[in-house]
Regions:
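Membrane-interface helix/loop boundary segments of multi-pass membrane proteins
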Residues: 130-152, 185-189
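Small-polar-interrupted transmembrane alpha-helices in polytopic inner-membrane proteins
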Residues: 86-90, 146-161, 177
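Membrane-embedded alpha-helical segments of multi-pass membrane proteins
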Residues: 12, 16, 41-47, 114-119, ...
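Juxtamembrane helix-loop-helix connectors linking adjacent transmembrane helices
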Residues: 62-124, 137, 142-143, 217-219
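Functionally important transmembrane alpha-helices
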Residues: 169-226
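Hydrophobic alpha-helical transmembrane segments
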Residues: 8-12, 76-84, 113-117, 147-155, ...
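Short juxtamembrane and helix-loop transition motifs at transmembrane-helix boundaries
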Residues: 1, 110-114, 128-138, 153-161
Length: 226
């Protein structure tokens, strides 16, 4: 496949698909009278499954890459230390903007919060790791020169969150893409990149920023914003 075709495929998958899914609720309301509930995660899982099956059909699926765990201790220290600093900054920013949101989710809906803390890393982060790190690196990264490759990967990861319909989701996830993709590139460890992704995601939900990332019901937004 030539470079132009590979880039077009990248745009269709990482930008065309989220854009189409963005309008699913609107079209469902218009033509069916009701919007589907809790459909984002199933859609993500279907796309991820399609990607994995596509690679398997081409004979290019290496299970060792999908379940790679090894990373030097210094990389774990870097990821955890950086998270501690950025988590403190995110807490301070939310405290300045919406102090009433701080820790509201676990306080007001502890059972739902616990479910999110467990399910988000196991389901959502794992699927996104396959789609936005493993698959992007093996199929599309080489289609972009130099630093454009990292920007393309971060932009793709960010644009997936257009489904949440707010700029904060796009901003946070673009920054996340600039963190998680280099971690995977440096180490080749899906585990470390996914742990880093899960740390930030679970922290955002817990501290109060999760109001910008809920889907399927109003429970999280109500728990955070009151």
């Amino acid at each position: 496949m030539n470079l132009r075709a590979r880039r077009l495929e990248f745009v269709l998958l990482y930008f065309g698909t989220p854009l189409a899914l963005r309008y699913v609720p609107d079209l469902a309301r218009r033509f069916l009278g009701a919007a589907p509930r809790a459909w984002v995660i199933p859609a993500l899982l279907l796309v991820t499954l399609g990607v994995v099956l596509s690679e398997a059909a081409r004979g290019r699926l290496r299970a060792a890459e999908l379940f790679s765990c090894r990373a030097p201790a210094r990389e774990w220290a870097l990821v955890l230390g950086r998270f501690a600093v950025l988590a403190a900054l995110l807490w301070a920013l939310l405290r300045a903007m919406h102090p009433d949101w701080l820790w509201a989710f676990p306080r007001r809906a502890p059972a739902f919060w616990l479910l999110v803390m467990v399910a988000y890393p196991l389901v959502s982060v794992s699927a996104q790791g396959v789609l936005y790190r493993w698959y992007f690196e093996r199929r599309y990264a080489a289609a972009f020169p130099g630093r454009w490759s990292l920007l393309a990967g971060a932009a793709a990861f960010s644009f997936a969150h257009i489904l949440f319909r707010n700029p904060w989701a796009l901003l946070f996830t673009f920054a996340g893409g600039l963190l998680f993709l280099p971690t995977y590139r440096r180490t080749g460890s899906m585990l470390l990149a996914n742990v880093e992704h899960a740390l930030y995601g679970d922290f955002l939900f817990t501290v109060g920023w999760g109001a910008f990332f809920y889907e399927g019901s109003q429970a999280m937004a109500a728990a955070v914003a009151g």
